[in-house]
Amino acid sequence: MNKIDAIELEQMKKNIPPFKPGDTLKVHVKIVEGDKSRIQAFQGVCISRQNGGIRESFTVRKISNNIGVERVFPLHSPTVDAIEVITRGHVRRAKLYYLRKLRGKAARIREKKYVAAQ
């Protein structure tokens, strides 16, 4: 392991829950306004994850007032306070960009069904 990899490894966050495209996420973001800071939640469907390592980012899409809003978050950014997985989605694609063209019920994603272990 070279020096750059070692530095990147120590700066990466450790408490990130496993999630995939299709999952509904609630991302808590730190917002600084002047000398005050607050945490704002952004809830939507993860439509993609890009790259890997410390440069990894993910895109979350939600519908707000009948307008689609997408935000790209760096995964290991200090402005991302927490990530919660609300529901797991069952999709067969890695990038869900086709959701941009769909409206209403057509844009729904099936929920993944779990079988309880016995």
From Swiss-Prot:
Keywords: Ribonucleoprotein, Ribosomal protein. GO terms for cellular component: cytosolic large ribosomal subunit. Pfam families: Ribosomal_L19 (PF01245). InterPro entries: Ribosomal_bL19 (IPR001857), Ribosomal_bL19_CS (IPR018257), Ribosomal_bL19_sf (IPR038657), Translation_prot_SH3-like_sf (IPR008991). One of its GO terms (molecular function) is structural constituent of ribosome. One of its GO terms (biological process) is translation. Gene3D superfamilies: 2.30.30.790. Disulfide bonds: none annotated. PROSITE patterns: RIBOSOMAL_L19. PANTHER family: LARGE RIBOSOMAL SUBUNIT PROTEIN BL19M, RIBOSOMAL PROTEIN L19. Belongs to the bacterial ribosomal protein bL19 family. NCBIfam families: rplS_bact. This protein is located at the 30S-50S ribosomal subunit interface and may play a role in the structure and function of the aminoacyl-tRNA binding site. This is Large ribosomal subunit protein bL19. The lineage of its organism: Bacteria, Pseudomonadati, Thermodesulfobacteriota, Desulfuromonadia, Geobacterales.
